[in-house]
Amino acid sequence: MVKPDIHTLAHHLKQERLYVNSEKQLIQRLNADLLKTAERLYRTSWIAKQQRINLDRLILTSAEASPAECCQHAKVLEDTQFVDGYKQLGFQETAYGEFLNLLRENPRLIASCLVTGEKLNQENAQSVIHTVFTSLYGNCIMQEDESYLLQVLRYLIEFELKESDNPRRLLRKGTCAFSIIFKLFSEGLFSAKLFLTATLHEPIMQLLVEDEDHLETDPAKLIERFSPAQQEKLFGGKGTEAFRQRVQAMVETNEAKLVALVNKFIGYLKQNTYCFPHSLRWIVSQMFKTLSCVEGLEVSEVRSMCTDLLLTCFICPAIVNPEQYGIISDAPINEVARFNLMQVGRLLQQLALTGFEERDSRNKSNLNKFDKSCVAAFLDVVIGGRAVETPPLSSVNLLEGLSRTVVYMTYSQLMSLLGFMRTVISSEQLQEEDRMALENLLATVPQTKPGKSNNDTPYSTPQLSPATTPACKKNRLPIVTRSRSKTNLMETENECSPQEVTPNQPEEVLVISLGTGPQLTPGMMSENEVLNMQLVDGGQGDVPVDESKLHGKPDKTLRFSLCSDNLEGISEEEENPCSTGPSNRSNSVSSLDLEGESVSELGGGPSGSNGVEALQLLEHEQATTQDNLDDKLRKFEIRDMMGLTDDRDISETVSETWSTDVLGSDFDPNIDEDRLQEIAGAAAENMLGSLLCLPGSLLLDPCTISETTSEAWSVEVLPSDSAPDLKQEERLHELESCSGLGSTSDDTEVREVSSRPSTPGLSVVSGISATSEDIPNKTEDLRSECSSDFGGKDSVTSPEAEESVHGPHHITTPPTQSESLLAMFDPLAPASSEVVRPKVHYARPSHPPPDPPVLEGASGGNEARLPMFCSHVFIHTDSEAYRQRHSCPERLVRSRSSDIASSIRRPISDPGWVRRGINEDRELLTGTAVNALINPPQSSSFSPSKDSSRGEPDEKKDSDDERSDRNKPWWKKRFVSAMPKAPIPFRKKEKQEKEREDFVQDRFYVAVDSTSQLGPHSQAAEDILAKYRNAIKRTIPNEGSTMPYEGADPVGDGESLHESPRDEALQNMTSDDLLDSANQVAHPQESAFSYRDAKKKLRLALCSADSVAFPVLSHSTRNGLPDHTDPEDNEIVCFLKVQLAEAINLQDKNLMAQIQETMRCVSRFDSRSCSKILSSLAEDYRKRASYIAYLTRCRQGLQSTQAHLDRLLQRVLRDKEVSTRYFTTVCVRLLLESKENEIHEFIQDFQKLTAADDKTAQVEEFLQSLYGAMAQDVIWQNASEEQLQDAQIAIERSIMNRIFKLAFNPNQDADILRDQVLHEHIKRLSKVVTANHRALQIPEVYLREAPWPSAQTEIRTISAYKTPRDKVQCILRMCSTIMNLLSLANEYSVPGADDFVPVLVFVLIKANPTYLLSTVQYISSFYSNRLIGEESYWWMQFTAAVEFIKTIDDRK
């Protein structure tokens, strides 16, 4: 195998580090931006819905609220304050949040209570209905809320409509709970708005263009619409036959126009049926299915009700008031147009019921002119859908994984809701099932009302309540976190009731937590966790495991399956393995598994060594509710706090010296949030599963996490080892805990340390510097990044690796931003990556990593890779151990790495070093293996034959061993039980490969073989080690507790250590592992530094090296030195010397310490070992491609979700704008109604004027007088400046509508005839003029977009606008459209006037808008003095084009 060049390797490692740091920072920013956007989205949504409800109150002008009160309330809503619920509810917020969450998740109970409340004639029933929609279900922004609300509607159909004597009358009345909720839902549903806009925009605009006359079809009403003078002029003498005939002719003309108009609406309805909202269709089909079963209800009656629901409650309101739904925005609808729209709606309803109901004869003539099945066909499509039980999603869920964690509700709404529920339950009218459910809910709610006095106890309420209640059965990534900032989540509505309106103070909306816990955000998983998941998946063989099965979720949204239901997925995956050993798991995970670790640990449970075991675990994924609760308690480390641990040996699980620290960390208030985030990290791991397309549970290998941390390096460990008053026995216990299973304990320890940012020793773990505080942020970043990589596969157990594991946890603590960021990604988690890697190498990786230039010879299959990490001495031994390592790479690696790492990490003089290494060995071995380790002669040299002979039999004895172990404390069980076996075929293949090779170095150690190959130092080391082994042997019986094994249990697999598939693998753990560790111990001066440790530190040094400082070595030197050469002279040391010189020159003390430590470790290896280290680093670099892919996908997912949230925010802002403008329009209408006399006088005066200037002056004067009156009106006292401007525009539109005919055609028939002449001229031109006509001279480059239909559409609607300002804006939009299309055609140049005017002329010819000359005259008369800037420029171009068209001779 060709050894990679150290310069190239260093270059690639540095590039990788820089890229990863950059991605992490970007992801962190994206996460922060995402939360801000979500917060703004929910806040805006809440306000917008309240504005809409306030608008409805204004339209109804009911007795409960005057227009002035509505306006005042609108002002208050704009200043709404969002405050955390605890500020008003105090510690009782949790109880209220639980109540609301459980109520929200019980649609049946809500429907039953609403129906019962209406039967009791509760005064606040309607306000409670609004609260349910706006607060409990948050306006259905989230699809989960939409699904719940659809279920509420379904139950309302069953409980309310089905039980009613006359359901149709109840529905038409519009005041029942079903009608109100359906209206609120359909108005806010975005897919419904899309359908209405697509269906109604074009026909309504066409109607506005042609709104000259009322389309009245009743002769009597038609006559009444004209004054006597007009009747005489139009129809002749009243009572004559000519009069009657002319009236009938006009009626028939109106009928023909109306039929054409209605047919246009029906055509658009049919064309857009495909985009009819699925959720509304589901409601209609549920109604039809439910009511069809009611005795006494004919199918025709049920169909009529469905028609009422669709047309009367959904489509027709949008037809009559399109501006209220945003269908028409800038085109005013005058009285004539409104009447015609009402006629269209009436006819549509009649047509829908044709054949099912008898209509009066007067309408028969109209209906006979239509295709009788036209509307019925549309209804059949909607009603005919299969009535499935599960509500459909209205659209693709782009926010999967994001979930609401709070509700918005005012205090009065909350009390009103509770009062309503208590009244309902006291009425005895609820069904028994619902009554009991409601009683259980209300039992948790405080009876006394919380007062403001609770404001003094804000901090007594936990900011983040752990998800321990049934309400938290789904822990999802909160879009909006429950931080002190006013996160918004749902809207509450009943601010509508007058008593709630506080005239002088803005409303306070309580942000009440639903009780769900915090979760990890995407992209925050450590490198180790990602690699572990990848490797665990690889260990399953070539058969991919469907992650969607593991998580019970579709695997479509990779980016956010990450965030969604992370904890839930993990808990399911853990359930089987963990349920048996909660104590071990909770201990190991306790404070140690902060972000990333907990993830891999928690998820690791089911990851078996072979696919069959994994599938078996999956089959049992569904656990009882209690199991779920237990799992979650474990995740939040609440079981320990609550005394719920069911493992009697917990005290033994943690060594005496460490237990205090570990448990203490559980209760350490300073890291509560860190731990919660850590747990969230677990969730993220789940998410990662999706990102990597790996099986979730398999990806989350417990071992991976714990491995990352190393015992020797944790702060706690060091003090405990060196404590002068510590008994030897206790030290040995600790040592034992550190080794083997003890490695778990180490992991735990390290994690704990990492969880406390202030604890010195983090940096010690990586060997970078003495304390974490001393290390600059960048150094920590490097360390965290590298630990996993260093270890790559090997570093899992190394101290840095362990630290890296801690890294993520550490990150959750308050250190600097970059630190915490890196920690979150915890690249240092080598352990996890290590452990998993073995599997990856032999399995097909889900993401093929790019080939790094460094790895020229590192390709190849298992064969090539094994030699990289294994020494020739352990060929046979390794075969079995290696196999197991692959089956449960994490655990195995941990045990191994912890052995070696421990031996390497501690000075020989430190008794803890020997104790630890030996204990680890002992933990790792079972039966003869343990004896061999304790026995000096055997431990000094394990024979390959012994190892290999041990491999196969152990496989068979695994199950028996496991059973025998179950009754023992876990620290006494064979370590083997903690490791799952690899699939048998895989093992055999490995074994064959190993046998084929002459040497295989242990994957994680620099291998040294038997004493025959040991140098004099090694022999001496063996002698020294033998003494310690004897000491340990004597103390073994007393060895009681060990921390959870680093690789095994930190994962949260507590007992799974023994019972999960990994246990077997660990049992079979290779003597080869032990051999390595023994040999390492045997050579304290030459081999004491573990292979992984050296590799980890070397990676740190290389990834921070500057290319300028690369030493210039000859090719021969670089290719390695002969074995007899002094280790000091190997090429890595030479390279590091140059780096050290640079560090000294720069006086970078931290870097100097790192490089010196790395040189100390590396100098112990010969050139051959150095070559293998470099090859291993290169291979690790290649395998980290999956981590890069993870970061990339997280970034893409966050960006996509951010874009979707931005779009949602745009929709909400648009809804808010539409509601506000329509509110202003209604207020203006009320104002003008009070000024009707003045307006009538103004119109009469205007008719008398003849000069255009006089008319313009009078219009301006009258408008100004109305503006002044508005300013004095009480309704407008609280209006904002923007509202006043909108009001002035609305007043102008209304007044100009009233005088439009007088102002537009001052010369009446003469103007009309003039326009008709030009219209005919243009009509002839359009037949002969083409885009390439010589008279136009349109440049050829712009002809590809001809005939510019969008611009033609814009100008055709100019007749729909009645004010000069609106007509100018219409012309402006047409010109802008043309310029955009021209720019699109030629992107290399900006179109000028010479390019634009010919196209404008062509568009006007083809569009041929009516009344073109009158339009020019109207704008020139009433708006010319206000034309400035862009408007003036485009108006000049427009008039020039019209003049040019008049000069074109159509005959030529």
UniProtKB/Swiss-Prot annotation:
Biased composition regions of type Polar residues, renumbered to the chain: 445-468, 577-587, 755-774
Identification of the protein by name: GTPase-activating protein and VPS9 domain-containing protein 1
Gene3D superfamilies hit by this protein: 1.10.246.120, GTPase Activation - p120gap, domain 1 (1.10.506.10), VPS9 domain (1.20.1050.80)
Lineage top rank: taxon: Eukaryota
Biased segments, Basic and acidic residues type: 775-786, 885-897, 947-968
Location in the cell: Membrane; Endosome
UniProt-listed GO biological process terms: endocytosis; regulation of protein transport
Ranges of Low complexity composition bias in the record: 588-601, 898-911, 936-946
GO MF assignments: GTPase activating protein binding; GTPase activator activity; guanyl-nucleotide exchange factor activity; small GTPase binding
Spans annotated as Disordered: 445-471, 571-611, 735-816, 885-912, 929-974, 1037-1063
VPS9 domain location: 1312-1452
GO cellular component: cytosol; endocytic vesicle; endosome; membrane
Gene that encodes the chain: gapvd1
Family of this protein: Belongs to the GAPVD1 family.
This protein's UniProt keywords: Endocytosis, Endosome, GTPase activation, Guanine-nucleotide releasing factor, Membrane, Phosphoprotein
Species the sequence originates in: Xenopus laevis
Function, as annotated: Acts both as a GTPase-activating protein (GAP) and a guanine nucleotide exchange factor (GEF), and participates in various processes such as endocytosis, insulin receptor internalization or LC2A4/GLUT4 trafficking.
InterPro entries reported for this sequence: DUF5601, RasGAP_dom, Rho_GTPase_activation_prot, VPS9, Vps9-like, VPS9_dom_sf
